[in-house]
Amino acid sequence: MKVFITQEIPEIASTLLKAKNFDVSVYSKNKPISKKELLNNVKDADAVISLLTDKFDSDILDHMLNCKVIANYAVGFNNIDINYARQKGITVTNTPDVLTDATADLAIALTLACARRLVDGIDLVRQKKFNGWLPKLLLGVELKDKVFGILGAGRIGTATAIRAKSFGTKIIYYSNSKNEILENKTGAKKVTLEYL
């Protein structure tokens, strides 16, 4: 069985596939694969491991004569024409919860970087302009007792709110539907999009 991987991913994937005697090939250029290169590599693949940057439209799918599965190395799969893949008998999978914590961590890291003027501090040090501590130097803003707004109360929004709550923030959120888990864990209040 031939497996094509559209970009280098953690080596364990190739190792496990090769241990099962799959013929694995990996696109190894350090840039997203072009449509032409994708067409050339998927035409005889039985399976493809794709990235969110790889567009699988009807043109690409029509060239996948042997393919039975596209395993999308991403949370979503809006880069793949799912309905057309189904018509072609190609199963599409994804990794729906793999980045929830990483994304929530990054959202909090960026919030802290803004609130505490982290980039300004780094620039000051890099430019060798830091001359020692001063009471108002890069003071920034405390998160405690601030209102923290969440747009979208799915897995990532909920995980971000839980982290933000640990800084003593008041959580408000907008979502199409009420999220009782979010509300119970953080005391969050659902508001309108306009209010948020």
Enumerate the language-model features and the residues they cover:
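Short beta-strand elements at the ligand-binding edges of bilobed clamshell
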Residues: T91-D97, V191-L193
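Short gly/ser/thr-rich secondary-structure transition/capping motifs
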Residues: S28-P32, L51-L52, Q127-K136, N184-K190
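Phosphate-binding beta-alpha-beta segment of Rossmann-like dinucleotide-binding domains, i.e.
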Residues: P96-V147, I162, Y173-N176
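Residue-level detector of anion-binding/catalytic polar loops
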Residues: D23, T91, A113, K170, ...
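Structured loop/turn residues at beta-strand edges in well-structured enzyme cores
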Residues: K43, D62-L65, R116, V141, ...
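An N-terminal-biased, well-structured beta-alpha scaffold segment characteristic
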Residues: M1-T93
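Rossmann-like dinucleotide/phosphate-binding beta-alpha-beta segment
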Residues: K136-L196
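Short low-complexity, flexible loop/linker segments enriched in glycine and/or proline
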Residues: N40-V42, I108-T111, T186-K189
